[in-house]
Structure formats: C-alpha cells, structure tokens
C-alpha cells in the first residue's frame, strides 16, 4: 500500500475531463453529461523548516492526527486523514519529531532528515493558501487548535500557492507550509519549475494529509479528451499555485 501511495504522489496519473453537453433544460440552463473519468491527483502535504524543533513538530503532528475524528465538524478535511497516508511520503525525508510520532502509531517513514529539529521551541508561522481556498480554511483550523491545545504557538498565514510557499520557507518568512507533493519534490530536487531557481532543501515533510483532485470542466460538447484541448483557452490558478 505504501508503494501505491508513493507512486500516486510522485506521478501525475491522468487528467480528469468532465465534458458538459450543450443541452439545455426548460430554464435555459446547461445540463451536464455525467461520465466516469480519471483524475489528476497529488497529495496535500505540510512542510517544516529544518530549524523547527523536534518537540514542536511532534506536538503539531500529534494534534492533527490524534484529534482528527473529533474535529470533522470544524473542517471536513479532517475526515480524509489517515496515519498510513500521513507517513507515506518517499521523495522528501521526515523530521525526527514527525518520524517519532508515526513510529509510535506503528508506521515507519521512508527516511528521516539528519540534523533537523535541533533547535529550541518558538512561535510557528504556517503559510497556507488564498483566503477563499481549502489550504487557508483548513490550515487556520489546524493552527488555532494546535495553539489552544498542543502547547505550541501556531499562526496561519495567507499564502500564494505551493511554489510561493516553498519560497517563504527558504526566505525564513514561515516555519510551516502547505504544499502539493509534486511541487515539494520539484523544489527538493531542483527540477521542473525549480530548475532555474535551483533546489530548496531546507525543509522536511511533516505529514501527507489528503489527495487533491484536479478536474477540467467545459460546456463545449466537442471537447471529450485532453487532445481536444489543443488550441483552446483553459482557466487555471495563479502562477505557482500548482493548478
């Protein structure tokens, strides 16, 4: 199962294209044609700078997973968390504090970052996402609960997407960050969108939280495959957002 998760995190499997026909009901609204589709799926992960103390990381991860079942009413994403998936990242090592927590729960991580976490406790700035997005809403709940219950001070910050969040870690403007798993790997290895910038390896993986699916929706009935998008305009997210 861990190999499966690793493959899903490392590779963009396929693109989900939901084709909506140009049929209209009596009200004039467009109605969708429902078909099974495959989906682009990457993991939503939390990263920590290597100078965040092991004790703080341990408390932070424990607060997320130990309280997930009781906090689904605070945010639905808590219901998607699992310890197995949380410990499944193979492309970037975990900090000792996170590795310790998952080991206590019976899950060994693939690798542990040597030298990470050898610092004192401090306030933690957690850069998330745009104010209207899931990263910000979920991250704010995580930060507030950890501050109120875990004995650490975490503040959620608005972010500008995965690539920007990694940059915030490198620049020392945040200690924790939401990121997509593919962007995380690009940064750590200095590939793809980080090829010109160079690798950023001042962080470790705190935990993988849930899978993110990306879908393309169209009202043009002639667009049924990815190839049909040739020459078409597609509305995407902000540069560096991962979408």
Residue ranges of each PLM-predicted region?
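C-terminal motif of bacterial Sec signal peptides marking the signal peptidase cleavage site
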Residues: 16-19
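Pocket-flanking alpha-helical
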Residues: 139-144, 148, 155-197, 216-219, ...
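An extracytoplasmic/periplasmic, membrane-proximal ligand-sensing/linker region
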Residues: 25-27, 41, 55-124
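Bacterial signal peptide processing site
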Residues: 21-23
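Hinge/capping helix and adjacent helix->loop/strand transition within the periplasmic-binding protein
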Residues: 43, 47-70, 146, 197-201, ...
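Bilobed "Venus flytrap"/periplasmic-binding protein-like clamshell domains
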Residues: 84-101, 121-149, 154, 212-243
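Pocket-lining segment of extracytoplasmic ligand-binding domains
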Residues: 25-52, 181-183, 191-193, 222
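A structural signal for short loop-to-beta-strand junctions that line the ligand-binding cleft
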Residues: 29-38, 195-212
């Amino acid at each position: 199962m861990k190999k499966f998760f690793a493959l899903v995190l490392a590779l963009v499997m396929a693109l989900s294209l939901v084709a909506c026909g140009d049929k209209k009901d009596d009200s004039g609204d467009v109605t969708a044609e429902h078909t099974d589709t495959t989906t682009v799926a990457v993991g939503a992960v939390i990263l920590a700078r290597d100078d965040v103390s092991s004790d703080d990381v341990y408390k932070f991860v424990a607060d997320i997973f130990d309280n997930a079942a009781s906090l689904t009413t605070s945010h639905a994403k808590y219901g998607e968390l699992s310890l197995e998936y949380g410990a499944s990242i193979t492309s970037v090592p975990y900090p000792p504090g996170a590795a310790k927590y998952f080991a206590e729960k019976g899950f060994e991580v693939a690798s542990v970052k040597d030298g990470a976490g050898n610092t004192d406790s401090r306030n933690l700035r957690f850069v998330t996402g745009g104010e209207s997005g899931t990263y910000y809403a979920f991250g704010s709940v995580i930060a507030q609960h950890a501050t109120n219950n875990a004995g650490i001070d975490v503040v959620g910050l608005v972010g500008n997407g995965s690539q920007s969040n990694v940059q915030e870690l490198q620049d020392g403007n945040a200690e924790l960050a939401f990121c997509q798993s593919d962007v995380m790997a690009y940064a750590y290895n200095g590939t793809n969108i980080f090829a010109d910038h160079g690798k950023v390896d001042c962080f470790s993986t705190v935990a993988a939280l849930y899978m993110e699916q990306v879908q393309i929706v169209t009202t043009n009935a002639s667009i049924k495959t990815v190839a049909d998008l040739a020459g078409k305009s597609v509305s995407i997210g902000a540069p560096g957002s991962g979408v």
